[in-house]
Curated annotation (Swiss-Prot):
Gene3D superfamilies: 3.40.50.1970, Dehydroquinate synthase-like - alpha domain (1.20.1090.10). It comes from the Bacteria. Zn(2+) binds at E186, H249, H266. It comes from Blochmanniella floridana. This is 3-dehydroquinate synthase. The keyword Cytoplasm applies. GO terms for cellular component: cytoplasm. InterPro entries: Dehydroquinate_synthase, DHQ_synth_AroB, DHQ_synth_fam, DHQS/DOIS_N, DHQS_C. NAD(+) binds at residues 73-78, 107-111, 131-132, 144, 153, 171-174. Its cofactor is NAD(+); Co(2+); Zn(2+).
Amino acid sequence: MIKRIIVNVKTGSYPIIIGYGLLNKDFMSYWTIKNGDLVVIITNDRVAPIYLNRLYNSFNACEIVTDQCILPDGEQNKSLSMLNKILTQLLSKNYDRDTILVALGGGVIGDLTGFAASVYQRGIRFIQVPTTLLAQVDASIGGKTGVNHVFGKNMIGSFHQPISVMVDLDCLCTLSEKEFRSGLSEIIKYAVALDSAFFNWLENNLDYLLMLNPQSLMYCVYRCCELKRSIVIMDEFDQGIRSVLNLGHTYGHAIESYLGYSQWSHGEAIAAGLMMAVSTALHIGGLISFHDAIRIKLLLKRANLPICGPEEMKPQDYIKYMIRDKKSRLGRINLVLPKSIGKTQVFVNVNTDVILNAIENIDI
């Protein structure tokens, strides 16, 4: 079964195609490319041995001219130097503005490819082909692109929408257990932020997801893409309601920055950040109930995700990174916090002492 979601935003419209086997030549009719197009597949040295030849051969079978650029794997490579490597290859081969970039990989590859597409000759087309659960449900949708900096995550970037997102659920079968569970953190975030019924479904179906049950995966990924689409079409450029999707990210990005974008995966950092947001909401009072907080904690634990930050990181270590967060203004920390499961709110100028106490006393 193939499912389609259309994302209509001010800068255009594009499909999210979800199904099994989309990298195979039999499904090329679903792709937003045609005979004679020139595509450059951007991938990494971990994904390339598994999927590059399959996609390359599918394109060639359809007379699509294909080149490739293979980058090193890892969040630490989401950098200006890797961006420059992509741009240098495109320029050295005289690729013009009709070239289409194809991001074959997880969130790092998607963000790098999208950013390269946004700046190369002032903008060319690109396609997202997410191969990780996290990228399939979140990073590949919505047009956010960019790279990290020593001073913070995603501090250099742009908005540039893909012309399509091709979600091949077969790719999930080759993920490590850690990579798969990392994606579950963003799925749980969606449920806590936006959809209490979906949270109930996750409580009842998490074991099926962990077993890679096809029907459960299809529903889960499709629902997350629906939720992301519903927010993006209202706030394409992240000026308002889209910030609710950053639930847990202010804390999580602090963890990633502190650790130099290594040791912890993005999903692991977001899971811990989600619990810190829950703890902060409890410390402020009048927001999320203790009962809901426990449900969130238990679901994260069942997914084998962290519910607190790294031991070597002290509460005060978070603050310097949180102040640099894109939601913060004039040195004041603004946070997305849960009011209940399925409802969130942006809180302005949250007291630093409350944040420190919430991180220190996160074990609810």
